[in-house]
Amino acid sequence: MGHREEGALGPYLDTRKNGAPLDIGHLGLDESRHVTPTSSRFGSAPRALTGGIAVLVLLAAAACSSGTTDTDDAGTQAVDLNANPAACSANDRVDSVDRASGPFTYTDGRGRTVSLDAQPTRIIADEESAAALMSYGIKPIAIWSTTPMGTSPILSCSDLTGIESVGETWGTFDFEKAASLDPDLVIGEFNPRFGQFGKLTTTADSSKADTIDRIAPTLGVTLDTTSTAKTIENYAGLASSLGVDLDTPQLADIKSDYDAAVTNFKKVASERQDLTGVGVWPLDVAYVLDPSADPDFSDYESWGLKMYTPDGTDDGYWKKVSWENVSSVDADVAFVYHDVANASDVKLADIPSRYPGFDTISAVEKQQMVLWDYGANKSYSRYTNTIDVYADAMSKAQKVTTE
């Protein structure tokens, strides 16, 4: 993630195999240049680990959620094991909008300025950018993704009717099909740390993006590895440049709901300063999170949540702790990462039996857990739900550890 070195272990692991090379000879290109190593969300992906679940654990009880929970009742209700921080709402689907006409100009995260004589209407986007654009009523003609579109957690709340696919496995892009769709613009999320455009490139190999540039101009929206909120702001800025009126009643209400959720989260954090969080991914060992490397939890820290930080990491993101020693990171509430690469119906109640020794963490033993669906938050509406679910979990938690 944000502060990992390339190739380091991170929560977005590729368990898929790249598709066969595409015949792009008529473009005058060497197809061998376009087969690159698989990539994780924040760098090159390592060999896949299966069954991965990351758990974010919060120490101590917390306060209210969505401004509706009385903090005097904190700890009197059980934490909802079925709460879904990536649940969809009516606000996740915004009707197509009439965009302002005229020329389009935008300087992207790579420092490139894209200038078009008219607003683009035929847009191809990666799954992150597509989800964000659709939250502003802009529907792409095609999407490339790391899983089939219908199973993508990032796209799960979007209306995909009529959208073509130009890639459904990690690091693949169907150049032939994309060219046949005659796009005006190709948009991908850009990670400045790794030079990664749409999970197709690395700092060492930009050939796939270079190839797409021969089909249509490419635009990289900056992924802020220190703040999910800032990444969403970047997408809002792009939507405005694409002619969307951000002050329409629906969009204004969505932003207002988000602001209210953040305000409530800050209230919860300020009222429960005994709360400390720690992130853990149970695999062969416990991977303990450095929260400053995660854009979601960097936001939560900036909003007042206290997080446990390990004494150093092995890769800039995780510190490996043996199961024999995991009790040293004891905690009161567990936020369980839903591994996108191995996504399935996670039953939180079953977690302790899958990882012997994991229940030495008090939160796991006491069944005080909630899911963490990292990577789904590319819009204000999706992030609002996540923030509300977490505030609710904090409000219901009991302190089950001793200082």
Sequence positions of predicted segments:
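Alpha-helical, coiled-coil/dimerization segments enriched in small aliphatic residues
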Residues: 241, 289-319
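Structured C-terminal subdomain patch of bacterial secreted/periplasmic proteins
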Residues: 230, 329-403
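A local structural motif
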Residues: 113-119, 157-166, 247-253, 303-315
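A short, structured surface patch at a secondary-structure boundary
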Residues: 122-181, 185-186, 190-201
